[in-house]
Amino acid sequence: MLMRRITIIVILMLGLLQSCCAGVRKYGVEVVKEYPHDSGAYTQGLFFQDGQLYESTGQYGSSSFRKIDLATGKALEKVDFNRKYFVEGSVILGDELFILTWESRVAFIYDAATLSYKSSYSYPREGWGLTTDGKQLIAS
């Protein structure tokens, strides 16, 4: 009786395992173009806004926010952060640039056009990803 139960359980588990894996789709990718990038930049946030590429980079001692020339990979403009901050996600909403930090739990606000510092505030958790739906900020 015990052996029969074990056999039934094993058969059911194998059936479930097979049905779970049967529906997995595989996708391929094709690289159509490559662009240069600063290999020393530890990318945390990356977005396009009005045809311009922006990147926030994080590392204690070398965090920055950059407006990037896509063709060369060079920073057209750059904001460096105090070495105590590990910068994470960033996004522009309206005329303001929002930048989160990781363990410091600080959010920065800059003028999006000039990259001039406006303010900072305490953020209630670790900052990670940041995006927008065009009306409000969305953080992970």
Q: How would you label these PLM feature ranges?
A:
Residues 6-15:
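Sec-dependent N-terminal signal peptides
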Residues 32-64, 79-91:
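Beta-strand-rich domains and repeat architectures in extracellular enzymes and scaffolds
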Residues 69-73, 111-115:
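Short loop/turn segments that connect beta-strands within beta-propeller blades
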Residues 23-40, 70-75:
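A short helix->beta-strand "capping" segment at the edge of beta-propeller domains
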Residues 55-59, 97-104, 139-140:
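Conserved beta-strand positions in repeat-built beta-propeller and related beta-rich domains
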Residues 14-25:
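Bacterial Sec-dependent signal peptides at the C-terminal "C-region" and cleavage site
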